[in-house]
Regions:
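Class I (Rossmann-like) S-adenosyl-L-methionine-dependent methyltransferase catalytic domain
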Residues: 1-5, 9-62, 67-73, 97, ...
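Alpha-helical scaffold elements within enzyme catalytic domains, especially in hydrolases
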Residues: 105-106, 157
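Short glycine-dipeptide loop
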Residues: 108-113
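Short catalytic micro-motifs in class I SAM-dependent methyltransferases
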Residues: 86-90
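Alpha/beta-hydrolase fold active-site loops
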Residues: 79
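A short, conserved alpha-helix within the catalytic core of class I
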Residues: 91-105
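A conserved beta-strand element that flanks and buttresses the S-adenosyl-L-methionine
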Residues: 83
Length: 197
């Protein structure tokens, strides 16, 4: 975020924030406390009105929560960044046109979209990631998909959009070694994209 934005005020959209938006809270705390930035987050998910009310109590005016459908009402670019963290595979990678429409909406309202998701390399790695996903979402009402992207299918997806890839990291170490096969950094990737003019 700091690499691509030198402004003091930063507006961030988080797509698919979930009910325990830890990533949002961590990013907010780092940018505000360590880097002294003025940060506002708008978090979107399939929240009920009651969920929105309860979540909005947590951080007062700095982090706001909204129902996903309201993104369509945003008419012009409003955000410096969009985070879409471990969300796309839950939509279902076979729903390619739907995912393209979502990413087009996000690149329309955000200068830069930060995508973090999972890569599989075959049957075994796909099922390891499914197991990890099941454990990670056990207490949430989130489906575990059957399939995850591989490098080729994700590259093909982006190739069908009018976007520029600013940066990509195809292997990220996120988990400690004692998790053995689940700590494989090749299971996680990041892409930063922006709309091509």
């Amino acid at each position: 975020i700091l690499k691509y934005n030198k402004q003091n005020d930063i507006k961030i959209l988080d797509y698919g924030s979930g009910y325990q938006p830890r990533v949002v809270f961590i990013v907010y705390e780092i940018l505000v406390k360590k880097y002294r930035k003025k940060v506002s987050f708008d978090c979107y998910d399939f929240y009920s009105n009651n969920d929105i009310k309860n979540l909005n109590k947590q951080k007062k005016n700095k982090i706001k929560f909204y129902h996903l459908d309201t993104i369509k009402k945003i008419k012009k670019r409003k955000y410096n960044f969009c985070l879409i963290n471990d969300v796309i595979h839950h939509i279902g990678i076979e729903k390619e046109n739907f995912i393209i429409n979502i990413l087009n909406d996000l690149t329309r309202v955000s200068e830069i979209v930060f995508i973090k998701d999972h890569f599989q390399q075959g049957f075994i790695s796909n099922n390891i990631i499914r197991f990890m996903d099941f454990l990670g979402n056990y207490f949430n009402d989130v489906n575990t998909p059957d399939n995850y992207y591989d490098k080729k299918t994700f590259k093909n997806l982006l190739g069908k959009m009018r976007v520029i890839v600013l940066e990509k990291i195809l292997s990220i170490k996120l988990y400690p070694p004692f998790l053995l096969f689940m700590s494989n950094p090749d299971f996680n990737f990041v892409y930063l994209i922006k709309k091509r003019k």
